[in-house]
Structure formats: structure tokens, C-alpha cells
Amino acid sequence: MTNFGRVITAMVTPFTPEGEVNYSVAEQLAGHLVEHGSEGLVICGTTGESPTLSWDEEFQLFRTVQQAVAGKAKIIAGTGSNSTHEAIAASQKAAQLGLDGALLVVPYYNKPPQEGLYQHFRAIAQAVPEFPLMLYNIPGRTGQNLLPETIARLAELPNIVAIKEASGNLDQASQIRQLTPTEFAIYSGDDSLTLPLLAVGGVGVVSVASHLVGDQLQQMIRAFTAGQVDVAQTIHTQLLPLFKALFVTTNPIPIKAALQLQGWAVGNLRLPLVSADAATQEMLRSLLQSLNLL
């Protein structure tokens, strides 16, 4: 059984002032995250600005972070694509690098029907039969919802072992849990829904907030699994304003601004994303100060 851990950080991609990938800062940030609660790192996911990275940049990032972490956390490569051929090639290369798994987003823009989604993910799984795969359902970005019945079919494939569920629908998450084996791991794709998702059978979170509060997320999940629901609820309530603030505009704009406020040289974003405006930066500064994060 593959265990990616409870708290997985969807890591930002740092850029230099010239807009090139800053591999040195990526290395430093990865090490910091692992020291502060992250048992896994998703590299080149949504938060990592994958749409504006080249495959060469992505694979260099995979190698850089893999070397920096040195086995202390799972490295999960964002190899999803709306081209099955490209997703297969990227996943095969990630497997050859010795990474711990891949995150595969639902194909976007071309809006395949459920049978097309099933065949897409099955083709990737069959191309890398020994490589653990995590599905990624985020209909707000892809325009298509991966339905529980389709997920259940995919969970029968031995190397499709988990899902990052970011539909925001707890009924759907409950149905996924009902239809899949207990060893199939369900991760929250929304920080604000991590605690509710645990209550319906989730195991953890693929998080943005864990850049800042990874240790606290670990404490919340541990408290819940130990039956200390009131403790978990208190942590959730304390962190909820942060969870909301990090999505006040398009992710990863706020988290990059927050990291810059903490002194991390993560740089700006690549167009068409833009940096946080002054009002957002000031809101984040005030919030981080109130949470003793500055």
C-alpha cells in the first residue's frame, strides 16, 4: 500500500527577477517544508504554475527537489495533461527518475465524457504499472467533474492509489469513500475542507496553506484521528481565515505574496498570472501578523 502521508504541500515554483526558474530557492524551500510538517511535496501542480513551465523546467525541478529532500518526504510529480500521449510520456519519465508518484489532473478544456476520462487515466496507469498515481479532480479549473462511479472503476487499477478531491462537494467525497476500497486514499484539495473531509473518510490534504502552517495541519489531523475532535476543531477555526485569504484571488497569487512577506525570494508569477495588488498584500501582512507568522 502506497502511503503519501497526511500533509502534502503543493509547492510553489520560485522564479528569479528575470523570470527564470530559481532552482536554488526551490531546493531551500523544499527542505524547509519537509522540516515543518510536509510528508510529501507535489511539484509542478496548479500551485507550481505548471501551465507556464516547459517540460524541461519541470523535470529539472523534479530532480532538484528530489535531491534536496533526499528521501525525507515523498516527491509527487505533476505530470497531468489534457493530452493522454503527453501525460504518458511525462509519467514514464517521472517514474524513471525514481520519484514517488504522480499527480494527474482531469483533462481540461477538451471536456471528455466519463468514459474518455476513464480510458485516459487507465492508459497512463498501464504505461507505468509500478508507479503510484494520484487522481486530481478540480472541476472549477478543468470544466469537467470526475464522477464517483468513474473514480471507483479507476481505483480497481492497482497503481491508482489516491485522489486529490477538490470539487468542494462533501457529498461527492462521501460517495467516493463508499465506492472505493479502504486503502484508496482520499485527500482534500481545499485547506478549508480538510477537517470535514476527514470526517467522511479522508486521510489528509494536498495543501497550499502548509507552506505557512504545515506543523499546525499535522496537529489538527493527529488530533482528529486520536478522537480529540474539539482540539482539531479549534485549530481549524484558528486557521480558517488563512485558508480563505489564500484563495481571495487566483492561487498561487496569495501564497506567493505571503511567502515573500516572510522573506522567501519566490519571485513574481509568469503571465497570464500577476502578482498580488497592494490591498491583498496588506491584508495578508495583517493576517500573518495576527497568526504570529511574521
From Swiss-Prot:
Positions of disulphide bridges: none
Localization, UniProt: Cytoplasm
Stored PROSITE patterns: DHDPS_1, DHDPS_2
Catalytic residue list: 136, 164
Reactions catalysed, as given in the entry: L-aspartate 4-semialdehyde + pyruvate = (2S,4S)-4-hydroxy-2,3,4,5-tetrahydrodipicolinate + H2O + H(+)
UniProt KW Mitochondrion keyword: no
Site label Part of a proton relay during catalysis, positions: 46, 109
GO MF terms, alphabetically ordered: 4-hydroxy-tetrahydrodipicolinate synthase activity
One example of a Gene Ontology biological process annotation: diaminopimelate biosynthetic process
InterPro entries per the UniProt record, alphabetical: Aldolase_TIM (IPR013785), DapA (IPR005263), DapA-like (IPR002220), Schiff_base-form_aldolases_AS (IPR020625), Schiff_base-form_aldolases_CS (IPR020624)
EC number: 4.3.3.7
Residue sites binding pyruvate per the record: 47, 206
Pfam families: DHDPS
First-tier enzyme category under EC: lyase
A Gene Ontology term for the protein's cellular component: cytosol
UniProt keyword list: Amino-acid biosynthesis, Cytoplasm, Diaminopimelate biosynthesis, Lyase, Lysine biosynthesis, Schiff base
Broad class of where this protein is predominantly found: cytoplasm
Quaternary structure (record): Homotetramer; dimer of dimers.
Protein family (similarity comment): Belongs to the DapA family.
Function: Catalyzes the condensation of (S)-aspartate-beta-semialdehyde [(S)-ASA] and pyruvate to 4-hydroxy-tetrahydrodipicolinate (HTPA).
Name the UniProt record assigns to this protein: 4-hydroxy-tetrahydrodipicolinate synthase
Organism annotation: Cyanothece sp. (strain PCC 7425 / ATCC 29141)
Phylogenetic lineage: Bacteria, Bacillati, Cyanobacteriota, Cyanophyceae, Gomontiellales
Gene it is expressed from: dapA
